């Protein structure tokens, strides 16, 4: 409903609610995230495996684009970067499953500091997933 509230012109429940709340014109939000750190077991409420996330994200993308087909969507990349490299599989499955629906993939790598070279090496290791 957020896309309708933020972007639909008028004449629907949520676009009219936006106007009633003091903003008659659409906000025009163009980039929307299809979840945040969805692979975050156990810390993320509502976490999913990649297959379940892809299914839910495809349905959400369809509904969101039906309201505003000009928006760009961001897929939830992995946030769980542990030594086994299972996150590579998450990102690949998401790209294979909803790559046709998203413009971006949100990668959540958290650098713990150090030299600029260590930053580029750390971040660059994630790029190999897209080779």
Where are these regions (language model features)?
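Noncatalytic carbohydrate-binding groove/subsite architecture in carbohydrate-active enzymes
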Residues: 49-131
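Secretory-pathway/luminal and periplasmic proteins that interact with or process carbohydrate-rich
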Residues: 11-12, 84
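Active-site groove signature of glycoside hydrolases
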Residues: 6, 12-49, 74, 103-114
